[in-house]
Amino acid sequence: MHTVKLLCVVFSCLCAVAWGSSHVSNRQPCHSPQLTSGTMKVISTGGHDLASGEFNYDSKANKFRFVEDTTHANKTSYMDVLVHFEEGVLYEIDSKNESCKKETLQFRKHLMEIPPDATHESEIYMGSPSITEQGLRVRVWNGKLPELHAHYSLSTTSCGCLPVSGSYYGEKKDLFFSFFGVETEVDDPQVFVPPAYCEGVSFEEAPDDHSFFDLFHD
């Protein structure tokens, strides 16, 4: 398995160069590996746990699957969503009842990929830079989402561009995303394929500013 640690070993020379030039403000956004998976946790800035579960992301096809951990909290329903960002389609899946809700997604930016117009803010060490295996070098990116009257901040590993954390600040809500145990593989590529019972389901109406961030709420 290719973990954050392995990626940092493989790209150690490149990272050393990057660290030495971290003061350069016009650094171009890095690109996520083609496949990533792991655990994603979302909380509100008020400290409320909104969702926690397994994510899978295909950066080449721009497809994302998130299945909430049913043991995470005492809820009556749990999130299982599949998003095809390129096509602008969002599926809300209920595997227990074999039902599916399909919506259009007009706004297609999200926090699994750094937007091309993001600004490189800084490169920092989390933990200790001098003690072996006691630190992680990250790059911080930020930018605006004018269509949503919002702005964001993203942290990725310097070695490999893996997601570490992200913040979204909007008019309706503020969200904080954390990523754990990130791998550069997906166990089952079929997670990006809608279940058969989603076929033929009509699109439900959604507002023009409907976005990935609307999935997470109290």
Curated annotation (Swiss-Prot):
One function term, GO molecular function aspect: calcium ion binding
Localization per record: Secreted
Residue positions the entry lists as glycosylated: 74, 97
Residues in the signal sequence: 1-20
GO terms under cellular component: extracellular region; lysosome
Keyword Acetylation attached: no
Magnesium listed as a keyword: no
Modification after translation, per record: Binds calcium through the terminal sialic acids.
Keywords: Calcium, Disulfide bond, Glycoprotein, Secreted, Signal
A biological process from GO: cell-matrix adhesion
Main location (coarse class): secreted
Assembly mode: Forms disulfide-linked dimers.
Family: Belongs to the ependymin family.
Function field: May play a role in neural plasticity. May be involved during axon regeneration.
Protein name: Ependymin
Lineage: Eukaryota, Metazoa, Chordata, Craniata, Vertebrata
Gene: epd
